Amino acid sequence: MKIALIGYGKMGHMIEQIALERGHEIVSIIDVDNIEDFDSPAFASADVAIEFTNPTAAFANYQRAFAHNVKVVSGSTGWIQDHKAEVERMCTEGGQTLFWASNFSIGVAIFSAVNRYLAKIMNGFPQYSVEMEEVHHIHKLDAPSGTAITLAEEIINDLDRKDKWVKGFQHAADGTESGSNEVAPNELPIASIRRDEVPGIHSISYDSEADKITITHDAHSRKGFALGAVLAAEYTKEHTGLLTTSDLFKF
């Protein structure tokens, strides 16, 4: 398969390594200093472009790739609030293909399934209050993380007593602290901590007077995310439309 990379930071380098190990060809690498290469024959020859950039660049990158009818796999977060409807329209009506996920880790896909199941169980146990915490490296710009938001939305869909998520306690990269996990009964607080070079930790806790249940996904490195992105690209080559991890992993 011919792959184009959009974004060549730590994730881009890791994706390149795994893609080559799996027998794929990298035909184009686009970063901030060569945006004009979107219009190159090499980019247009790609079966799939894998995009990991930042919230401000992602949507424009999708548009540039779609202009050449190149399918996109993206793990960029933070753009959905402003552009979700337009991206959905481009895929459902415009014939384009985007595989988007807030997290491509196989472990997170499994964790997500456990999260949904546990939320359904907790409908029968109203004495448990739920909250979430995510910890990431100091370079991560958005908070809460896209993965935390996805997990929170799953809980809201399956746990009747919660209907919205809100920012909880915040510990910024510069050490400043703000916010609180003390929220209204219908709200799910997400605490965000920026610390050192942590790849990503997501914890969901159900607390009662008697005990506390916590489930956690702790990423040891970016390798799991990169492998998942390449697996998603392999899937996307053979499929069309708006895709996500529930299409790739059937559980």
Task: Please provide the spans of the model-predicted regions.
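Hydrophobic beta-strand scaffold residues
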Residues: 26, 72-73, 97-98
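Rossmann-fold dehydrogenase core element
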Residues: 86-105, 122-132
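Rossmann-fold NAD(P) dinucleotide-binding segment
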Residues: 40-42, 46, 52-75, 84-87
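Short, ordered loop/turn segments at secondary-structure junctions
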Residues: 32, 77-79, 103-104, 135-137
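Rossmann-fold NAD(P)-binding glycine/threonine-rich loop
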Residues: 76-98, 109, 114-117
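C-terminal substrate-binding/catalytic lobe of Rossmann-fold NAD(P)-dependent oxidoreductases
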Residues: 2, 6, 10-43, 124-251
